[in-house]
Every structure is written in C-alpha cells, then in structure tokens.
Design a protein with these regions (language model features):
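Buried hydrophobic positions in well-ordered alpha/beta secondary-structure cores of metabolic enzymes
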Residues: 13, 25-26, 65, 99, ...
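Active-site C-terminal subdomain of aminotransferase-like
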Residues: 16-17, 193-279, 283
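Conserved beta-loop-alpha segment that forms the PLP phosphate-binding cup at the N-terminus of a helix
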Residues: 55-84, 88, 92-96
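Active-site phosphate-binding strand-loop segment of PLP-dependent enzymes
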Residues: 117-174
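Conserved active-site segment immediately N-terminal to the catalytic lysine
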Residues: 181-193
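Conserved PLP-binding catalytic core of the aspartate aminotransferase-like
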Residues: 287-318
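PLP-dependent enzyme catalytic core of the Aspartate aminotransferase-like
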Residues: 329, 333-386
Length: 386
C-alpha cells in the first residue's frame, strides 16, 4: 500500500503537467481582447512554430485534438473531393468516422492493429486514384503504440503537387522527430495534453500555404472551426471566439521550458523513457505489440493467463500508478504505458518496479528486480551515446 497517496499518470494522455504551467493556469484569466493577452498569444504561436519546426503560422483552437482533426478535414475537403485515409488503429478510424459524417468520399488503407502503413502503399493508392486531393494519417497511433514512416510517406505525397498531407501528430509532437517544413507536411495537428505538459483544452494546427490555397476555395460550410475566420483573428493576436485562456497561459510556461531545453531534447527524453520501459519488458520475455514503435507509447502483450485489467487495477489501487489497456479490437489484450508529459527516468524506474510486482501477483513468472536492472543498464548506455 501507499501510506502517502500520490497519483502518477503513465497513460498516453492526459499526461503529468509542468508545475509552472499549472501555476499559470490557476492565475486569474487574462482578458482575451486586451493587449497583454494578445502579446502572450503571439509568443505562444511563435514558440509553437519552433516545436512544429515550421515557418508557417500555427493556429490555436479551443477544443481537443479531435476538434483539430475535424477542422483539418472540413476546411480542406470540398464537396465531391476524395480523401485517402491511412488507418492503423482506433485514432486512424476517427478519420473514417469524420469522413463518413461529412459525406466525404474516401479511399482507405487499413492495416491490422500493431502494424504501420508503408510509403509504398500510399504511393500505390495515389497512383490508382489520381482524383485523391488529400491524405490523412497519424504520425503515431496512440491506441497501439505504432509509428508510421511519416518522412517516407510525405516523400510519396509530395510527388503530387495537387495533394495535401494532413498529419495527426497529437502524440507525435515532442516524442518523435516531426519536421513540418523539411518534409512538406501541409497540416499538422497537435494537442495541449500530451508532450506539451499542460491540461487538455487546446488544439494547434500548423498550416502550409499549399493548404491555405485549398482552404480558401473549399466550399464546405463550417462555423466554429472555420480556419479562415481564425486566421484573420489570430493575425491580430486573438482568436475568433473565446480562447482557452487558462490553458494558453499554462502553455506559455511549458513552451518556455521546452525551448530552453531544446525541442530535440524533449524528444530525447521520451526516447529514454520508452527505451527503459521496453528494456524491462523484453527482459521479462514479453512481446512489444507494434511492429514499429514510436516513443509516445509502449504497448506490450502480457503473458497468457495474465488479465490486463487486474494489472491496471493493482497498479492504481496499490501504487497510485495509472497505465492504460488496449482500445478497439485490442481491448483486454495489451497494456500501454505513456512516455509523454512531465516525468523523468527516476519515475519511469519506479513505475517499472511497481509493474514487476503487479505482473507477478497477476500470475506472470518473472524475477523481481530484473526489469529495473535492464532499465538501469539501458539508462547507462543511453547516457554514453548522448
């Protein structure tokens, strides 16, 4: 038992928040039409450009990441146009749900949970369907931990000047290299509650000039998520409607830290946490679920006879550690550990120790301490390589 109760969040999101961000979010909200907030808003936009690695403007919306996904689709797909959807899990399936909701004709590349979509598959679909006008995909599929070859897929899409590439990078930003301008990514969607270390409530979209040309001629009705209306307002340091003021105040504090440490070091931190967790899991003889893993999430398959729900319950009730199970078709079959947010190796090491006990008491056969030793060895080697 924990005599002093303290919750530690190792889920894919929401994630542990930066204390300075929480402190700023608790300050009395600024007036969003006054100059002091406009100046703060512009500073946040400039900071986001550095995280996204883009010179294009980054719009800030008061909604979840799913709202950002919806905005990216309804503003770019005119009635009668066809989209290519790249689907590798539950959040890829959200592209399907959005397209079907708005009556958008679609071609779908769908792979089994745990797999990644290959650039050659995207190239083949574009060749077979020359009327495709946009490609929608995830950088990392949160439901499985799988990572797509974003750079390789972008290279195939860029062979078609008339096609835009829209990327859900909600768990990719800050955990995986995302080079928006260098790779030619037209719209990249982010969310505040992941590697940015602040509460939910803000979606961010970087938008290329090629994407803006499509948005300007898109005849699909939209209101709250009208990016043209937002672009006009945000050029003046404000949003079209009331923004998530407190979250933006917290986001400014988080960006101050991220830019001070360096965006690449934020990615390196996620790489370290993921590598340590996977070293332990492999030491226990368990299988990492996805064929190609990103750094945002580690998904693994417990031994036969070990109930993931019992492991999660013990982690929560006995240690105050929150981890996640599977989603969609993998519900009840895998466990997922998040590596984004405000935590470090010491916390990851403690989580591994707790997980060893929970797995053992749920029926797994493993040596207590073996995973921690594997994680420590990984940490030592990681430090030597930096």
């Amino acid at each position: 038992m924990n005599l002093i109760a303290k919750t530690r969040m190792f889920m894919p999101g929401p994630t542990p928040c930066l204390p300075e961000a929480i402190a700023q979010a608790l300050v009395t909200p600024m007036h969003h039409r006054k100059d002091d907030f406009k100046n703060l808003f512009r500073e946040v936009q400039a900071g986001l450009q550095q995280v996204f690695k883009t010179r294009s403007e980054v719009l800030i919306l008061a909604c979840s990441g799913s709202g950002g996904m919806e905005a990216s689709m309804v503003n770019t797909m005119a009635p009668g146009e066809k989209a290519l959807l790249v689907v590798a899990g539950k959040f890829g399936e959200r592209w399907i749900e959005l397209a079907d909701t708005f009556g958008i004709e679609r071609v779908t590349i769908q792979v089994p949970y745990g797999e990644s979509v290959e650039p050659a598959q995207v190239a083949a679909a574009l060749e077979a369907h020359p009327d495709i006008s946009a490609v929608f995909l995830q950088a990392t599929e949160t439901s499985t931990g799988a990572m797509n070859d974003l750079e390789g897929i972008a290279a195939q899409v860029r062979k078609r000047e008339d096609v835009i590439l829209v990327v859900d990078a909600i768990t990719g930003l800050g955990t995986t290299p995302i080079r928006t301008d260098e790779w030619g990514l037209d719209i990249v969607v982010g969310g505040s509650q992941k590697a940015f270390m602040v509460p939910p409530g803000v979606a961010m979209l970087s938008i290329s000039e090629r994407a803006w040309r499509r948005i300007e001629k898109c005849g699909r009705p939209r209101y709250y998520l009208d990016l043209l209306r937002e672009r006009k307002a945000q050029a003046q340091g404000q949003s079209a409607y009331t923004p998530a003021i407190s979250v933006i105040q917290g986001l400014k504090a988080a960006l101050d830290l991220i830019l001070k440490m360096g965006v690449d070091n934020l990615v390196a931190n996620a790489t370290l946490q993921a590598g340590a967790a996977r070293a332990a899991i492999k030491c226990w003889g368990m299988q990492i679920f996805p064929r190609v893993s990103g750094n945002a999430v580690t998904a693994f398959i417990p031994p036969t006879g070990v109930d993931p729900s019992k492991v999660m319950k013990m982690m929560r009730d006995r240690f105050g550690v929150l981890i996640s199970g599977g989603q969609g078709s993998m519900k009840g079959k895998i466990l997922r550990i998040g590596h984004l947010g405000y935590f470090d190796f010491l916390e990851t090491l403690g989580m591994i120790g707790c997980l060893e006990i929970a797995l053992t008491e749920a029926g797994a056969e493993l040596e207590i301490g073996s995973g921690c030793r594997a994680a420590l060895e990984y940490y030592r080697e990681f430090g030597r390589s930096q």
